[in-house]
Amino acid sequence: MRTLFNLLWLALACSPVHATLSKSDAKKAASKTLLEKSQFSDKPVQERGLVVTDLKAESVVLEHRSYCSAKARDRHFAGDVLGYVTPWNSHGYDVTKVFGSKFTQISPVWLQLKRRGREMFEVTGLHDVDQGWMRAVRKHAKGLHIVPRLLFEDWTYDDFRNVLDSEDEIEELSKTVVQVAKNQHFDGFVVEVWNQLLSQKRVGLIHMLTHLAEALHQARLLALLVIPPAITPGTDQLGMFTHKEFEQLAPVLDGFSLMTYDYSTAHQPGPNAPLSWVRACVQVLDPKSKWRSKILLGLNFYGMDYATSKDAREPVVGARYIQTLKDHRPRMVWDSQASEHFFEYKKSRSGRHVVFYPTLKSLQVRLELARELGVGVSIWELGQGLDYFYDLL
């Protein structure tokens, strides 16, 4: 994989298409503002010839707002679709109102679970809960479940040790979580805890999650778990959550939000989620396809901008991506091995940049993979994507 990217960088560096513009050419280019459609389309992107590998920056800028409003509630993907929304990218709240029927679960990133003392727990972040938005989303998307992410925050190793070794602690934790769900009219939670404990005390963590799931189920609530990739990015090594843990938790949890993104690093720039790695992460977790429908394949709706001279990277969301396309009008390149588009541009101060950001084609390929593997998808996160992405779901 790394050899491929070294060749890729060499090809980019030697490419003649990025020659410096003359002053007159630069003025001509600057005088032409790329157009953006503001109206809806009567056809989805699949019928407009937009899901292609030979993509043009001008096409992305022109079409990205133009989704098919007539089919905004129609589903094209049969598996479960979980979408995350965050307070810091508020466009995601609007997305769920328009496209809510395309999702089975929406997970607002609102809440943190903290341990305050012996058998004392508190769920914080409740000030972010928007009951009006929840009512509006449910009104337009019947059967949609709102399952906020619940992050175990500020837990020390001693906190974990004391809780995981005590049935009373686990019981109080479960009671606290269930009561918050009832009070706030949630349909359950997406629990994020596995990364916090690393590889320590996995047996105790599985026991706690099993108990928590049972308590939620007794209250007719859902229990999902965020899990890291089964294969560590850039290696052939197993990750922190493998087939062994999956086999124990799959019978008791309702779903697993699999983080199949963030593959590349600032020191090794490249795609966000190479397709072969994504496939392998699912196959390692469940080689016999026993619980595949509970796996939610992670799709990133954000990208990465790599400054090659600084070994640095920054996340790219939709608005910045579109602005970069407007400013630089780059040549879009399809990486056939990773099944992702990328482009290069230059800044006077920071030098050469390379951007990997999802496109209609890269997303379609991953949705097809999800269908083939028999899994659902989870999207991080709805406020970061482009509006016409949702025609694919």
From Swiss-Prot:
It is found in: Secreted; Lysosome. One of its GO terms (biological process) is innate immune response. Residues 1-19 form the signal peptide. This is Chitinase domain-containing protein 1. Keywords: Immunity, Innate immunity, Lysosome, Secreted, Signal. InterPro entries: Chitinase_II/V-like_cat (IPR011583), Chitinase_insertion_sf (IPR029070), Glyco_hydro18_cat (IPR001223), Glycoside_hydrolase_SF (IPR017853). Belongs to the glycosyl hydrolase 18 family. The keyword Lyase does not apply. Interacts with STAB1. GO terms for cellular component: endomembrane system; extracellular region; lysosome. Saccharide- and LPS-binding protein with possible roles in pathogen sensing and endotoxin neutralization. Ligand-binding specificity relates to the length of the oligosaccharides, with preference for chitotetraose (in vitro). Pfam families: Glyco_hydro_18. Residues 79-393 form the GH18 domain. It comes from the Eukaryota. It comes from Pongo abelii. The keyword Secreted applies. GO terms for molecular function: chitin binding; oligosaccharide binding.
